[in-house]
Amino acid sequence: MTGILSLGAVPPEKKSRYGSLIAPQLLAPYHQHFFNMRLDLAIDGINNTAYMIDVEADPDDADYNQFHNAFHINKIRLDTEKQARNNLCLEKSRSWTFENNSIKNAIGEPTGYKLYPGDNAIPFSSSKAWWRKRASFVNYHVWVTPFNEKEMFGSGNYPNQSQHDTGLLKYTEQDRSIVDKDIVLWYTFGITHIPRQEDFPVMPVVTAGFALKPNGFFDINPANDIPKAIKKTNDECCQNIK
């Protein structure tokens, strides 16, 4: 993001708890930016399943954990739309995978892709705020729905004219099954902007985003272009050359 800040004038020597002075008598309010991405997944086919991955430390007093550093993952299948509504959790290093259970990779696991969240935020406005009533996609970072060609926008078709949410909150209240279905991932991410003097008069670029990376989709690193060895012994150094 970049652009020009929305500013307000304040009396000399006056400060505000709701914004930053970025020049004499110029106040830039604190604010947030939120984005919602609709990702129509098709991982090795259209029938996919979503999983939430939480990391958990093992008990400190366990006999097998004498070095006190063991941890494991809990892989939770998300069966319905309401179950899939979740937020990031740093305490659990939470992530999500999306898999095709009918297609197996070289080690017999489902092929899939993994969501790697980037920088994010939660809304500080109350749920009573009008913008949140109209754009409830900010309530959760992750939503999953079955594909529906009429459900194209996280905040519904006409959010500026609505009296309540007509988007993701309404869609997911149906609580439809999302197991082995043609599913859509909706990812919400945001930035909390506390303006600084360096943002004036024109902001430098600020980035936000996420990554969707293969997770067991390929059998090895697909960028590895070294051919497999064909000789079984080290007797001949040039056996691969023909």
Residue spans of the language-model regions?
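Extended effector regions of multi-domain proteins
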Residues: 1-242
